[in-house]
Regions:
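Serine-hydrolase catalytic machinery in alpha/beta-hydrolase-like enzymes
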Residues: 29-134, 151, 194, 271, ...
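C-terminal catalytic histidine-bearing segment of alpha/beta-hydrolase fold enzymes
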Residues: 179-183, 211-212, 222-281
């Protein structure tokens, strides 16, 4: 399903001295600057990874702030992955950044183009293999991940949103099949599985601001992957996550839902589960 030539990057990939020096200038505190934005990186000690997780922060966060979650950071680095965290645009009169994720609402930046430029920079300057990049995000970062996967599914080989999905009105369809693992807290009250009304008196009001329904999102993903049945094909409750997977779908696609007994958090053990899933695709 996922093929990527990225021939325009071949010259940059050959420029070893430039690539190494440019990459070394980027850290968890010093941003890498790309078109329309910036991102921060952490790399495993003493290693030159060829795999990466790009992690999109939630509402009011920042790329640098992602690394304050040491559990997430260490879990990714310990697996030998580079961790990259782009920054959303700062909000007027508010602290932190956010994302123009919903295609039907005002766009402060072409977020798909920006995140794609982060991908390209990682490939060119950090020698990351384009077939070994997992895009993930939490809360609104999970929503941004989902909308990118829906609109431009071939941008990344796989997607793993956490605690955030589509908003209302839901997409009517996606541009192609995906490999996607959605993780969500069973008792999430900030972004409930069924969604939440943030503005307006009814989710159907004109101008209402309402989160979407995760189960409806899974229906959209099943349609994108041309899955044979509504019902999942595999169930696994043996570990900390309650997992269900749809296997009888388009060749090369993958779809899984993982729930856990908790709220609006990145759950302990998520990185191991997600990277195990990614590496076994």
């Amino acid at each position: 399903m996922f093929t990527k030539t990225l021939t325009t990057l071949s010259a940059a990939l050959m420029g070893g001295v430039f690539a190494i020096s440019a990459a070394s200038a980027c850290t968890t505190n010093t941003p890498c600057v790309v078109a329309d934005g910036e991102y921060f990186v952490a790399t495993p000690d003493g290693e030159t990874p060829d795999s990466a997780v790009i992690f999109i922060h939630g509402f009011g966060g920042s790329g640098a702030g992602v690394f304050r979650n040491t559990g997430l950071t260490n879990s990714v680095l310990d697996r030998g992955y580079l961790l990259a965290a782009p920054s959303g645009l700062k909000m007027p009169d508010r602290n932190g950044g956010s994302w123009s994720f919903h295609p039907d609402r005002a766009q402060r930046r072409d977020e798909i183009a920006f995140i794609t430029s982060v991908r390209d920079d990682l490939i060119a300057k950090h020698r990351i293999d384009p077939d070994k990049i997992l895009l993930s995000g939490f809360s609104i970062g999970g929503s941004m991940t989902s909308y990118l996967a829906c609109a431009a599914p071939d941008t990344f080989p796989a997607y793993a949103p956490i605690g955030g999905s589509f908003w209302r009105p839901h997409p009517t369809g996606c541009e192609g099949d995906v490999r996607l693992l959605h993780t969500h807290g069973w008792s999430d009250g900030t972004v409930p599985l069924e969604g939440r009304l943030l503005r307006g008196t009814d989710i159907n009001d004109v101008g209402a601001l309402a989160q979407g329904d995760v189960f409806h999102a899974m229906e959209i993903w099943r349609a994108a992957n041309d899955c044979v049945h509504l019902k999942a094909d595999r169930f696994d409750t043996s570990g900390p996550f309650w997992r269900r997977a749809w296997d009888r779908c388009l060749p090369g696609s993958a779809l899984e839902l993982a729930l856990f007994p908790g709220g609006h958090v990145i759950p302990k053990g998520w990185a191991k589960m997600a990277l195990d899933w990614f590496e076994n695709l």
